[in-house]
Each structure stands twice: as structure tokens, then as C-alpha cells.
Design a protein with these regions (language model features):
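Short, well-ordered coil/turn segments that N-cap beta-strands
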Residues: 7-11, 37-40, 65-69, 94-96, ...
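Active-site mouth loops of central-metabolism enzymes
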Residues: 8-25, 69-81, 136-151, 221-234
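N-terminal beta1-alpha1-beta2 module of alpha/beta enzyme domains
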Residues: 1-46
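Active-site pocket-lining/capping segments in soluble small-molecule metabolic enzymes
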Residues: 115-135, 142, 186-239, 258, ...
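Conserved, mostly hydrophobic/aromatic
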Residues: 15, 41, 90, 158, ...
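Short, acidic/polar
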Residues: 20-34, 55, 80-87, 147-156, ...
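Active-site-adjacent beta->alpha loops and helix N-cap segments on the catalytic face
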Residues: 1-3, 23-25, 47-61, 79-85, ...
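Catalytic beta/alpha-barrel core
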Residues: 40-51, 73-74, 98-101, 140, ...
Length: 273
């Protein structure tokens, strides 16, 4: 992925949630769906504050099938000793890319009584990750957050700490996204715009915290139930094609951890491969 970005290629990455049980076969099967259509996947660390298989164990299996992992290290669950040990272990196993984000609080997960550690913040963690020679380090930002100025201040700190690329939360409102792009113009980092295919009207209703224009809402709502997934793919492809034309966008990150079979469809229909 680092080579692709440096060459100016339009990069495609995707989310990868490790399974909630010990199931190496599932990891390999899902990896094969994504292997030839994305440059890398972000392997999440107990996403949504729920117990999942270790991201480092998952990343090892992904490497074995030829899929490049970007390993998230959670600041919520480990102190700085454990974090540095995990990073060294991951590098020893062949991991070259890492990801840092402020994840869900443990109270919203499946172990609400768990103790949050938060020994480091994301800026400090990025600094540690960048000590690894030839590492690639990413983080995430919400272009539609309010007030955005505070998030941009935090992003500036991460850039100063050495972050190489940012992924955004899913983009549906292209005009507001362009405003965000204008605010970070000139920053020395790569940007992957987030996209998310809408699988159904029910799925759309669970996305209430995202900024989704009314015309997109109506397109899904007015589609027959058996055609909603198809319409969701069509909308996502339209957004991808528009994003590719925006200066400063170096690629896309596909949020489809619960619908991974949609990823190769999106990539093919958007003419990305």
C-alpha cells in the first residue's frame, strides 16, 4: 500500500472485523474475497468495544493468504507496555502498517464492566508507531463532525506526530466533503475517503449518526425491498466515481465489514481494477 500511494495510484482499502470466536477458516475465507480487490484491510482491535479475535493473530493469517493487514492497536484496552509489546510482535510477524483511532467506550460494548486503560492518547501512540522503521501509520477523521475545528486541531497534532494517511468516515454528502478537503489542503499526508454501501432501508435507519442527503434516503426508501441492496451499490459506485475526481483524494476505504461480498462488486463497477 505504501508503494501504491507513493506512486500516485488510487488505493482501495476495506474494514476487516476479526471473528468473535476462534475460527481461522472464516478469516481465510473472508480474506480470499478481498485479496485481489483491495491493497490492504484495517484489522480492527475489539471493534465497538466487543470481544473479537486478536488483530495480530488475524493479521498473521491474512499475510499467509497474501492480503496486507493494517493493524489497529487499541488505546482503550492496554497500557503502554502491552501496546509496545504488541507492536513489536506484529512487526516480527511481518506487519508493516498500523492504525490508531479513538474507539467506542467500553460501556457500550459486551463487557460494560471492563476497565478502560487509556494510558496513551492517539497522538502518543502514533509517535510510538512511527519509531518502527519503514512503518505506515494511519488514523481516522469525521469530515462532518461539529465543531469540525476541534477535530482539525487534533488532526494537526497527529500529523505532527508523523501520521502518514487518514481515512474518513463514510462520505454521502459530497459538497460538505469538498469543504473539508479545502480545509486540509496542503497537509503532507494521504487521504482515503470512506464509502459505505447501504444494504437495505433497515440498515440505513441504523446509520442515524451519519450525514446522508435526503435524495439518497429517498432512493433507498422508495426502492422495492428486493432491490434496495442493488440501489445501495449503485449509489456507492456513483460516490466513488465522484470522489476519484476530487483533487486531494488518494483512494477510498470501504466500510462493509458486514457485507464483504459487496467490495469486489463496488471495485469492479467503479472501474477501480
Amino acid at each position: 500500500m505504501k508503494t501504491a500511494l507513493s506512486k500516485g495510484q488510487f488505493v482501495v482499502t476495506a474494514e476487516f472485523y476479526p471473528p468473535k470466536e476462534a475460527n481461522g477458516s472464516e478469516i481465510k475465507e473472508r480474506a480470499l474475497v478481498l485479496k485481489d480487490v483491495v491493497e490492504a484491510v484495517v484489522v480492527r482491535d475489539n471493534p465497538l468495544a466487543q470481544v473479537h479475535t486478536s488483530p495480530i493473530a488475524t493479521a498473521t493469517l491474512l499475510l499467509n493468504v497474501g492480503l496486507a493487514p493494517i493493524v489497529q492497536i487499541s488505546i482503550r484496552d492496554k497500557n503502554r507496555l502491552a501496546i509496545q509489546s504488541d507492536i513489536l510482535g506484529a512487526v516480527t510477524l511481518g506487519v508493516k502498517a498500523f492504525f490508531c483511532l479513538e474507539d467506542c467506550h467500553q460501556r457500550v460494548g459486551d463487557n460494560p464492566g471492563a476497565k478502560g486503560v487509556f494510558d496513551l492518547d492517539c497522538v502518543q501512540l502514533i509517535s510510538i508507531m512511527k519509531k518502527i522503521e519503514h512503518s505506515l501509520v494511519g488514523t481516522r477523521i469525521n469530515p462532518f463532525a461539529h465543531p469540525l475545528e476541534l477535530h482539525l486541531v487534533n488532526l494537526s497534532k497527529k500529523i505532527n506526530a508523523g501520521v502518514d494517511f487518514i481515512q474518513t468516515m463514510p462520505v454521502f454528502d459530497l459538497e460538505r466533503f469538498k469543504e473539508f478537503i479545502s480545509l486540509i489542503k496542503g497537509e503532507n499526508l494521504y487521504l482515503l475517503a470512506g464509502v459505505r454501501p447501504i444494504k437495505s432501508w433497515q440498515a440505513l435507519q441504523s446509520m442515524s449518526q451519519m450525514v446522508i442527503p435526503e435524495n439518497i434516503v429517498q432512493r433507498i426508501k422508495n426502492s422495492p425491498e428486493n432491490k434496495q441492496a442493488e440501489e445501495g451499490i449503485k449509489i456507492c459506485v456513483e460516490i466513488i466515481k465522484a470522489l476519484k475526481q476530487i483533487k486531494g483524494v488518494n483512494g477510498i476505504h470501504i466500510f462493509a465489514h458486514d457485507w464483504e461480498e459487496a467490495v469486489p462488486i463496488l471495485v469492479r463497477q467503479a472501474n477501480l481494477k
